[in-house]
């Protein structure tokens, strides 16, 4: 969320994430992705402060997530932000992914970083490995 967006409580944000999770899963299935495959669920974390992100990802690792190396990017205003993914292999099960999201949203709240949704890759014989992200349109 940008600073211009209306503030959402953690509970409201989690409800939005649940709806987006179901949309992503339905999009994958509608596109023919293998429903019984194991998917690498990539949860996106962002922070302006390296130490806050570092503390959060150490805790995410202890929760069983694989944490990918952080990258430094610039936002639309030119400010530097650090981004990384916390990854967990999972079935396309909304309740399982909801539980992962809830853990990481609460972690983001604890360390004052941003949980920026999740994405995964299409799985199937014709997979080209396009990433499906929350908020993307078909």
From Swiss-Prot:
Keywords: Cytoplasm. It is found in: Cytoplasm. Pfam families: RraB (PF06877). The keyword Kinase does not apply. InterPro entries: RraB, RraB-like_sf, RraB_dom. GO terms for molecular function: endoribonuclease inhibitor activity; enzyme binding. GO terms for cellular component: cytoplasm. It comes from the Bacteria. Globally modulates RNA abundance by binding to RNase E (Rne) and regulating its endonucleolytic activity. Can modulate Rne action in a substrate-dependent manner by altering the composition of the degradosome. Belongs to the RraB family. NCBIfam families: PRK11191.1. Interacts with the C-terminal region of Rne. This is Regulator of ribonuclease activity B. It comes from Aliivibrio fischeri (strain MJ11) (Vibrio fischeri). The gene is rraB.
């Amino acid at each position: 969320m940008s600073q211009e967006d209306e503030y959402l409580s953690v509970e409201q944000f989690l409800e939005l994430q649940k709806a987006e999770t179901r949309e992503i899963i339905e999009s994958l299935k509608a596109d023919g992705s293998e429903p019984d495959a194991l998917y690498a669920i990539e949860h996106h974390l962002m922070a302006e402060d390296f130490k806050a992100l570092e503390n959060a990802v150490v805790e995410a690792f202890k929760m069983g997530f694989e944490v990918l190396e952080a990258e430094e990017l610039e936002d639309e205003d030119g400010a530097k932000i650090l981004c990384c993914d916390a990854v967990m292999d999972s079935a396309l099960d909304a309740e399982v992914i909801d539980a992962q999201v809830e853990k990481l949203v609460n972690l983001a709240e604890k360390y004052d970083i941003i949980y920026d949704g999740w994405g995964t890759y299409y799985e199937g014989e014709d997979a080209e490995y396009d990433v499906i992200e929350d908020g993307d349109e078909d």
